[in-house]
């Protein structure tokens, strides 16, 4: 017990010296948090020190492994499984772009396990808007899991699948600033997707998150941040990408001006309250949103389609996503999920 008690101040000292934790140390720390072994004062100091130092890929990977193992899920027996969960936290108040993307990708025939929560950034999280559109957030876990095979998409409401994380809620609420937990959500999907698109709230996180995904064994991923400040690919400025493919991470820049898209400022992508965002999502998935709304979803869906291996390049992915949106197939997929989770 003394040995464990001595460990936490040791880890804090290491972080204050601006030395990153190893993956093993990060696992120890997360286990300590979940088992309520770390004193509150030390926990707060560790979270602040991590944030001040800058989170490393190894710290993210180590903590994510523990949280995934502690979740109520387990891997699905599928060779291809995609998630489009981002970090949120960009503060831009856009409509739920990555949520719309999930239904486009599913309508393309790719199994999707969308992991999400209530709002972390602007006004409306994926769980908020999907609940407003009729998705049962309280469906039984086995029903949620079965939706992947039966519908082609499911939604995992994070608090239902991560009961162990209740242990860390007091630290997060007390600090009222961003912590490593804001980054862990997209990495701990309980159904273990092997391919992901993750938007992050800061450019410097792109290579860090991409490397964390590599350490966690993902087969393919794109991590992105738009220079407009979005955790999505926008229609005004280039987007920085960290691409994980073949076990290697490379960086690229995606310029919307190169792809015959509707170029538009962030203002054109704004959402509102839950009802407004639900209305926008309905229009977009039915193919009747504004040109900017339709195209920002098509662009971000193209990234996911390429990660999934069904689009040879972004241009082809954009065309495929536009066609899916135009015929209302993504809306049909949402209605199928609503019906299945209510049964």
Swiss-Prot record:
- What catalytic reaction does the record list? N-(5-phospho-beta-D-ribosyl)anthranilate + diphosphate = 5-phospho-alpha-D-ribose 1-diphosphate + anthranilate
**Purpose of the protein:** Catalyzes the transfer of the phosphoribosyl group of 5-phosphorylribose-1-pyrophosphate (PRPP) to anthranilate to yield N-(5'-phosphoribosyl)-anthranilate (PRA).
- The protein here is known as Anthranilate phosphoribosyltransferase
Q: Which gene encodes it?
A: trpD
Sites binding 5-phospho-alpha-D-ribose 1-diphosphate sit at: 86, 89-90, 94, 96-99, 114-122, 126
Give the highest taxon in the source lineage. Answer: Bacteria
Checking InterPro entries in the record gives: Anthranilate_Pribosyl_Tfrase, Glycosyl_Trfase_fam3, Glycosyl_Trfase_fam3_N_dom, Glycosyl_Trfase_fam3_N_dom_sf, Nuc_phospho_transferase
Residues annotated for Mg(2+) 2 binding in this entry? 231-232
**Keyword set, alphabetical order:** Amino-acid biosynthesis, Aromatic amino acid biosynthesis, Glycosyltransferase, Magnesium, Metal-binding, Transferase, Tryptophan biosynthesis
What family does the entry list? Belongs to the anthranilate phosphoribosyltransferase family.
Report the GO terms under cellular component.
cytosol
How is the cofactor bound, in the record's words?
Binds 2 magnesium ions per monomer.
Q: In which pathway does it act?
A: Amino-acid biosynthesis; L-tryptophan biosynthesis; L-tryptophan from chorismate: step 2/5
Residues bound to Mg(2+) 1 are 98, 232
Q: Describe the protein's quaternary organization and the partners it interacts with.
A: Homodimer.
GO MF term set: anthranilate phosphoribosyltransferase activity; magnesium ion binding
GO BP terms, alphabetized: L-tryptophan biosynthetic process
Q: Where does anthranilate 1 bind?
A: 86, 117
Enzyme Commission identifier(s): 2.4.2.18
* Cofactor(s) annotated in UniProt: Mg(2+)
Annotated anthranilate 2 binding lies at 172
């Amino acid at each position: 017990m003394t040995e464990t008690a001595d460990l936490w101040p040791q880890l804090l000292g290491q972080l204050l010296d601006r030395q990153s934790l190893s993956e093993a140390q990060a696992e120890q720390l997360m286990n300590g948090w979940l088992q309520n072994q770390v004193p509150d004062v030390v926990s707060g100091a560790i979270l602040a020190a991590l944030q001040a130092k800058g989170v490393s890929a190894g710290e993210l990977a180590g903590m994510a492994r523990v949280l995934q193992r502690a979740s109520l899920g387990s891997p699905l027996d599928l060779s291809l499984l995609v998630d489009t969960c981002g970090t949120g936290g960009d503060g831009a108040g856009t409509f739920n772009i990555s949520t719309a993307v999930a239904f486009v990708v599913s309508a393309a025939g790719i199994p999707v396990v969308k992991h999400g929560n209530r709002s972390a950034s602007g006004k409306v999280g994926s769980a908020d808007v999907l609940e407003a559109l009729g998705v049962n957030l309280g469906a039984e876990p086995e029903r949620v899991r079965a939706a992947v095979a039966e519908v082609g998409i499911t939604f995992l409401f994070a608090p239902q699948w991560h009961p162990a994380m209740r242990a860390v809620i007091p630290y997060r609420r007390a600090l009222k600033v961003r912590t490593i937990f804001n980054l862990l959500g997209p990495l701990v999907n309980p159904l273990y997707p092997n391919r992901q698109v993750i938007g992050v709230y800061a450019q410097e996180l792109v290579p860090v998150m991409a490397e964390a995904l590599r350490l966690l064994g993902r087969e393919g991923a794109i991590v992105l941040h738009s220079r407009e400040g979005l955790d999505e690919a926008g229609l005004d400025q280039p987007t920085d990408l960290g691409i994980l493919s073949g076990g290697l991470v490379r960086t690229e820049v995606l310029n919307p001006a190169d792809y015959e898209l509707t170029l538009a400022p962030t203002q054109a992508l704004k959402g509102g309250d839950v009802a407004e965002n639900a209305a926008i999502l309905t229009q977009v998935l039915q193919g009747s949103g504004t040109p900017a709304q339709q195209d920002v979803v098509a662009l971000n869906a193209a990234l996911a389609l390429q990660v999934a291996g069904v689009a040879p390049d972004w241009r082809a992915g954009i065309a495929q996503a536009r066609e899916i949106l135009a015929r209302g197939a993504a809306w049909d997929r949402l209605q199928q999920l609503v019906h299945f989770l209510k049964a």
